[in-house]
From Swiss-Prot:
Protein's UniProt name: Lipoprotein LpqB
Organism this protein belongs to: Cutibacterium acnes (strain DSM 16379 / KPA171202)
Main localization, broad class: membrane
Source lineage: Bacteria, Bacillati, Actinomycetota, Actinomycetes, Propionibacteriales
Lipid anchor positions (S-diacylglycerol cysteine): C21
Cell location: Cell membrane
Length: 591
């Protein structure tokens, strides 16, 4: 079934356009892809052929590698390349190893065949992608003669697919789970072969429960004893029916609403599905706020997706120590009134301004000015200031304080080089206890996801700066940052070994500033949250970019970057950025 726009389709398209193809898939139906950049970029479901009579070792191994790209009939064609005693014992579902096939083809002799290639990543049995770094695949296929035909006696653990095949014939599906407070939905991204990426597969992933380590901060709305009892069906107008066990009829209205929101958003990625209805033991299940036919759509549960409604963010900049707004058209800098704006001096100027998804109204006779948060010029004080006021308050102190962020609950977060490194100020202005283990590394930049559960981190150890994703939780009155997973990008298409800044573009996409080598120019890249896809967003100028801020959106990109020489550029489309201001020392965005 066709999926709605997949951002990896865009990433894959750009990578192919920039680097060319290392191999060509055989044939198959095409799927709709994402956006203007990917109008011609569509996922291909490979239709492989079994081995021909008398096929050489090279043809058998090449055919097997291609056949592993198709999961149809439990990899029936791929099994036909194996010896008869191995074909039924091979478990292709154990894992998926993705390798770089560029200039790395199988090597054979008159009786052997082996493949040596860099490993890009692996997909586990639940469909989660795990990027790798500095790993090499070394596999001997154990060629054997069977009834006069060459066959493979030593298949890999799971399947092997090239990076190009992964980008072209696998699909990305977000599976949604609830926060512990049941007020937001957070996507867990999985990857499946396109032929197997259907609503039933998505529901199986959802009903399997919250995977580790997300189970520490998320939960499912599916109560114990309630199960999906069969396969889904989609009618001619796009209504999918989800069959639940009879016990679902015992759920309270609030439980039904939470369950419907989780299922509906999980199925929202399929283009053929417009609305969802549920049955309990074969009878129609009534839902709060449902239409007369008891169908619901994702729009009904939009409040569970924590993305701002605005289509155009407000850009805030600092020029010559003064805070101000940048007009939507650009080139017009409106200095704010008050101590950190028009009245700013060298003693009260700021080094950083906090971004937020909250709306920050302009001061007017009927409205007081917005409350802003910033870091002092010496990076030792976290400040709060109401626009138009002459008073500046210090919320916390530290050393080398990072650009702060205001979260949806009005709390403020930043990092310091001192202990405790994580600083969180509650909405009431009090400093909260924090618990974090960085494993001896330092945070050099961070960005909290719109769901306020995931945190993207630029982590430094020695001269190395890399990307990591951690989880935020609140336990016994303290804020915990835990389960930090490294996201290596050195094996990706863009080969990024040095990351300097990061911002969330959506719930599943990041923009990072990075470069491949120390002497390179730092430019923006769009990255899938699990590291499964990456593409350049264009080299903007000959000067490296110093900062990136963004307002997360469900689709599209609202990002602003600041160069090392003070040029502010706003993302327009594809690889286009528009210069909007010069002489800028700091930047932030708000809804």
């Amino acid at each position: 079934m066709t999926l709605r726009p997949s951002r990896r389709a865009v990433l894959s398209a750009a990578a192919v356009l920039l680097t060319g193809c290392s191999e060509v898939p055989s044939q198959g139906p095409v799927k709709r892809a994402d956006g203007p950049r990917a109008a011609a970029q569509e996922s291909i479901d490979v239709a492989p052929h079994p081995p021909a009579d008398g096929a050489s070792i090279d043809l058998v191994v090449g055919g097997f590698l291609q056949a592993m790209a198709s999961a149809r009939d439990d990899y029936r064609v791929a099994r036909s390349y194996l010896t008869s005693d191995i074909a039924d014992r091979w478990d292709p579902h154990a894992k998926v190893t993705i390798y770089d096939a560029t200039n790395h083809k199988p090597a054979s002799t008159v009786a052997t065949a082996a493949l040596q290639a860099p490993v890009v990543g692996q997909i586990d049995s639940r469909g989660h992608y795990h990027p790798t770094s500095s790993q090499t695949l070394n596999h001997d296929f154990g060629m054997a003669q069977e009834s006069g035909q060459w066959r493979i006696s030593r298949p890999p653990e799971g399947v092997l697919i090239s990076q190009y095949t992964f980008q072209r014939s696998w699909s990305t599906i977000p599976i949604y789970f609830l926060t512990e407070a049941a007020d937001r939905l957070v996507p867990d991204v999985i990857h499946l072969p396109s032929a197997a990426a259907d609503p039933d597969a998505a529901l199986r992933a959802m009903t399997a429960g919250v995977p580790k380590p997300l189970d520490a901060v998320l939960r499912t709305a599916l109560p114990d004893g309630v199960t999906v009892t069969g396969t889904t069906s989609v009618d001619a107008v796009g209504v999918v029916t989800v069959p639940l066990s009879a016990s679902a009829a015992q759920l309270s209205p609030s439980q039904r609403r939470l369950l419907a929101s989780q299922v509906t958003w999980t199925l929202n990625g399929f283009a053929a599905i417009s609305r969802v209805r549920f049955t309990a033991g074969g009878s129609l299940l009534s839902l709060p706020e449902a239409a007369e036919d008891q169908t619901v759509s994702a729009d009904l549960y939009a409040e569970f997706i924590p993305l701002p409604a605005t289509h155009s963010p407000t850009v805030v900049a600092v020029i010559k120590g003064q805070m101000g707004r940048v007009a939507a058209s650009g080139h017009n800098f409106q200095i704010m009134p008050g101590a950190l704006g028009r009245e700013a001096t060298t003693n009260n100027s700021v080094a950083e301004v906090a971004s937020t998804q909250l709306t920050m109204p302009m001061i007017s006779p009927r409205s007081p000015g917005a409350v802003w948060h910033a870091v002092s010029a010496d990076r030792r004080s976290l400040l709060t200031w109401q626009e138009g006021s002459e008073d500046i308050q210090v919320l916390a102190t530290g050393v080398n304080l990072l650009r702060p962020q205001v979260l949806g609950d009005h709390s403020i977060m930043t990092f310091s080089d001192t202990d405790p490194t994580l600083i969180v100020i509650g909405s009431d202005g009090t400093r909260m206890s924090t618990v974090v283990d960085l494993g001896g590394r330092r945070v050099r930049s961070f960005s909290v996801a719109p769901d306020a559960v995931q945190v993207a981190l630029v982590l430094e150890r020695g001269k190395t700066r890399a990307l990591g994703i951690g989880l935020l939780s609140r336990q016994e009155g303290a804020v915990h940052l835990s389960h930090i997973a490294d996201i290596p990008l050195s094996s990706s298409d863009v080969n990024l070994s040095i990351i300097t800044d990061v911002a969330w573009l959506s719930q599943t996409r990041l923009c990072v500033l990075g470069r491949a080598i120390d002497a390179g120019v730092t430019t923006p890249y769009e990255i899938a949250v699990d590291g499964s896809g990456a593409t350049s967003m264009g080299q903007l100028t000959a000067t490296s970019m110093a900062a990136v801020v963004a307002l997360p959106k469900e689709t599209g990109t609202e990002a602003v970057v600041l160069s090392e020489d003070g040029i502010l550029l706003r993302h327009e489309d594809s690889f286009r950025w528009r210069q909007i201001l010069q002489g800028v020392s700091a930047v932030a965005v708000t809804a």
